[in-house]
């Protein structure tokens, strides 16, 4: 294990960190959690209200908004861990805390798997647009089920390893972060092939539904690129750390703490990307979003009594 273990692996502290700095990081993560939950909840409301968004190609996107909203819970748990590191409170090692940490890993895992599933779905929609239109709803339901089954297996494995053989947890961590890299590899390959297809211009342009799918594909491409830029630094950093490279042993604990929290903040910001880019890139989403705010800001009409 690297010389900076995660708090769920071993309860540790950073005595050289000031209380004010710890409080500042707690505030940052707290605000990020609120923003993640609020924006993704708003995204879900917009999807539910706008009928034009109730098409099959949007099912995985809607599911991603739901998963990203739950990522806000992971940020809250991150703040709980941070308070333990800063000696604001104590986290005791027991089955309940281990279950909480399993959930802490579950939601980002589900988000990564869902992004991979979206990239494969967009690849199929780009290369086989007419066959894609014939896909039944139950296929998307099965895909969502696979996302959560895989997430459940990974989270259960983490819980069992932590309970039965906590010393081997760093091996699980390497496998976990490697799984994230594998999901990102699928995403990169999928969207690279899509980009080549779109640039070559061999896709038909005359069908309205096909053009709409192209817009959605480009939007999800931008979302994924930004997501990778936000997530990969943290994933690569933790993978290298768990490999116990000498470079990490040379970093002071205070420097590690700040670097780790900064990369974590960027990683969680990935769950803020989707609602923002949807608002700028998907016309139906933008229209529905303005409609929601317009209804809330519109004063109630008062009819005079005769």
Tell me what each language-model feature is.
Residues 18-33, 56-118, 170-173:
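Extracellular TM2-ECL1-early TM3 structural module of rhodopsin-like
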Residues 29-33, 70-89, 104, 108-112, ...:
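Helix-to-loop junction signature of class
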Residues 62-65, 108, 141-145, 174, ...:
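Internal alpha-helical transmembrane segments of multi-pass membrane proteins, especially GPCRs
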Residues 108-143:
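Class A GPCR helix-loop hinge within the 7TM core
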Residues 150-193, 260:
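Extracellular-loop-to-transmembrane junctions of the mid-late helices
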Residues 193-237:
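Intracellular effector-coupling site of seven-transmembrane GPCRs
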Residues 236-239, 258-306:
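Seventh transmembrane helix
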